[in-house]
């Protein structure tokens, strides 16, 4: 029989990335968390956490994390379904269930919050959003640190199901002054090699995809690193560099003349999918169905 106090310690370490932060979340000492994880590893006969900065789950650890969080979600659902049993309802039904999801920053900054707000309020559900690049969010559900993910990966992660949400369209944009300074002679291999671009983080490959489409070559321009979606767009508006920005964030700026499209008609489309556990959990299934429906109102 699994000891859920030990499993909770494992989940906390994987979720928070360190034993110290897990200890604060559980209101115990780091030593206690370490002892619980070590005891669990001894009982299952396998290393469950790769110690590092951050700590991450091993394959076995990810399986146990997913199991533990599924049990927690099922208990939350059970508490809401048994109001006629006061003791059980009191034990399980008072806390709002929490859904931990991985979402790319562009989606959070444009459509995701508007899509899910009403559902969260009506169903008394809390969101714990993990920000990651859209090409890497699927890894979060694979390693057991989230229960769902908005991702570019169409193929379902093992034990999950995948549904298409829609498409985000990105365009290469910059300020008019920046365009005149760097691209007066055209957007080509030489000008793209010299002009600074804006990258969200090292995982952001949209700028590289655009460069390869235009030049059919690998070009390494000077780069600003700005891991904040509003700051990213602002850097383009103020002439710091050019970048790939979603239409939903730049349409008004382009209409006002604060941004210009560098190569009209050469947008990049990014298909987004919702991946979540295949295990049927009522409100998690309802969340996925709602997200698919609402995403259609915001995405192409």
Stretches with model-predicted labels:
Residues 41-60:
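A short LG(V/I)-centered, amphipathic sequence patch enriched
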Residues 161-240, 254-267, 297-300:
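C-terminal regulatory
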Residues 29, 36-39:
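Residues within the DNA-recognition helix of helix-turn-helix
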Residues 43-44, 64-92, 291:
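Alpha-helical linker/hinge and terminal dimerization helices associated
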Residues 16, 25, 41-47, 122:
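Residue cluster at the C-terminal edge of the helix-turn-helix DNA-binding motif
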Residues 93-158:
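Central regulatory/effector-binding core of bacterial HTH transcription factors
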Residues 264-300:
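A late-sequence structural motif
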Residues 11-27:
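Short helix-boundary/capping micro-motifs
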